[in-house]
Amino acid sequence: MRFPLYLILISALAACSGGSKSPADVSEVLLKDIFPLSGDALQWSLKATNETELKSYLEKTLVSADKIQIVPPILSAVGLPIATSAGLSGAKSSSTPSQTTLQEAGVDEADLVKADASFIYSIDPLPNSEGRLMLNRHKLGPSSGNPNLSLSDSLRLGFSKGVQGSSLYLDSDRKQIAAIGTQSSGWSYGRMPVIDWFAPTAWRNGATEVVLVNAPTSGSLKQTRQIKLGGHLVGSRRIGATLYMVLRSYPQNLTIGSATKVTDYLPTISVDGAALQSLVEPSACLVQSGNANASADIITVLAIDLATEKHAHAARCFTGGTEAFYMSDQNIYLATTRTVYAMSGDVPQYAAETSTDIHKFSLQGLNMAYRGSGNVKGHLGFEQNRKSFRMGEFNGTLHVLTETRTNWFPTLVVPTPLIAATNVVNIADSPGRLSVLQEKQGTLAIVGELPNAKRPEPIGKPGERLYASRFMGNRGYLVTYRLIDPLYILDLSEPTDPKILGSLEVSGYSDYLFPLNDGLLLGVGKDAISDGLPGDGRMGWYQGVKVALIDVSQSSKPLEVDRLIVGKRGTDATVLQDHHGIAIQILNGQVKVAMPVKVHQTPTSYMNGGPSDYYGFSWNETYKFEVNLSQKKFTVRNSLPSSLKSERWIGNDRAVIYMDQVHYYQDGIWVSGTW
């Protein structure tokens, strides 16, 4: 199913094309695209178009798509995709606070909380429940003595009515904040925005805004610019002063006829209250004519220079869809499931034969160029916040992990033997698949796969699902799970011949993997125990939060060298919902880790003593521990308790480590303590 988005690239390279560009000047800064040779274009390829062709395409799809009925969302609800990641920013010195965890070093990600050597910035709800509109700056105290933060100053962000602040970027060198706000036209379901992915018109009235704020060390916060964009925010990235955002929208103008211009169907931009203009020029758009699930959704690639006094931007767009993206420091890859799938509650059910399209654009400041598209078997998984982790780039080669099972719920799967006498398992039974893609003549060609005829060993056991995955250089790490946690190490040094180097089986699973150095991984997930029922013994119940230290220095023999279990069944950690929900600081061979958790370990009257017993809520806290990299051991420190005593949703909780202090954020409320 195509899930079109806008990809907004907000760039801060002042030297590009001599300064400010208006929307009408967009095409002047575009790089040359690379398309397949005639006859080599595949059904997933994008192609150049013109204003007439684009208008015809959009009007044709508008006629059919607008007939779709919007169904009650509670039955088909998914949250807006989260742009996810999980790398680490090592501390430069003890006076540097912990930073947002990142998937790619040097590719920053937005979050509710940002910090530098002097201040912690947060985007907070107003006390009168008007929404998350307040930018607060707290002064960090000295290394010893009272660790409590002091409020330095505040600024009510100038978002439009109905737009809520969602995240921040901090440019410490320029003393600049970029605050992002969003407005959803979807329904509200609890704390998650609910959108029906299969009713494109639900995306028609979305809005995204960027507010720029000067943040001098001595002086007050001051808003300097407001950029209003048509479209729903899906995710963002930043390289230096260049901010990259992904949005999705649907034409608001449904009038079809000769008097309607194609720009009437395209998203708009307004800067500092100026009149609305087209965000992207038709000549900068591409179409996916081979898409059988065509819709009028548009993905726009926009670059805005944030380092200049005057607004400047460039833009691209393509029709089709994207449900996830991954970005390196040079390229962005946009992926979407090709076949239609249904929803079961808030998780998808994929078609039996599913594949995923991937589109590549190169990035160079305000310049963006289409480099080709590819298609891989399988899908990127069931959880939106893990999909970007399924992709990774190394030396220009893209690695993609997909899975083959059609639904989230555990099932009993019997492998299909190819040859009973040799007990060789059918490659199709592998829960995970690795595809290796390289750019070739305007396409992304598959040059290597796992499993394959030469290396048929499956990635995971029958019935398992992919959980954590992480690409680091010429190594890949992934976790599958049903009861035990098989960690696989992949050798990606030869693109045409990837291989499994080793595996490790331990109880439970990891949702995220964080590299601590070249030989140690930190895994965070859940423990699990067997259900005790007859069968293959691989069905189990998850328990408390599990933290594992995994030695991968010998790739063929990975070892779990230490572990921690937090709470009982029902315990949750923010990092399991959002990879930014963990603070990791690495300094002089010592690692400090702080993660907000909601601990459940209170027995209840309906428990029966079995592994499925769900414990009652006990307390909220920031759980703290250290990792000795040379000894490969955990040391638990005293937790920092929350000032909020009742059970609550912890998805927005954060922690910041600063010297011998730890600061615990809970939706605008700070609790501070010593390490």
Locate predicted features.
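Bacterial N-terminal signal peptides
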Residues: 4-14
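Beta-sheet-rich non-transmembrane sensory/scaffold domains
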Residues: 17-675
